[in-house]
UniProtKB/Swiss-Prot annotation:
Keywords, comma-separated and alphabetical: Amidation, Disulfide bond, Immunity, Innate immunity, Secreted, Signal
Tissue-specific expression: Hemolymph (at protein level).
Gene this chain is encoded by: BomS1
Stated role: Secreted immune-induced peptide induced by Toll signaling. Has a role in resistance to bacterial and fungal infections. Has no activity against the fungus C.glabrata in vitro.
Annotated source species: Drosophila melanogaster
Positions where Glycine amide occurs in the chain: 43
Entry protein name: Bomanin Short 1
Disulfide topology: 36-39
Family: Belongs to the bomanin family.
Length: 45
């Protein structure tokens, strides 16, 4: 049972990292809550 919990935490961690890093050709665009083409987040400007 402990092995199952460790695997679950590992998989959830991978999903969190995959969601935090958008797979887009331009790393300057950060996708937040949906399909955003030109969302540049730099110092709130």
């Amino acid at each position: 049972m402990k092995f199952f919990s460790v695997v679950t935490v590992f998989v959830l961690g991978l999903l969190a990292v995959a969601n935090a890093v958008p797979l887009s050709p331009d790393p300057g665009n950060v996708i937040i809550n949906g399909d955003c083409r030109v969302c540049n987040v730099h110092g709130g400007k």
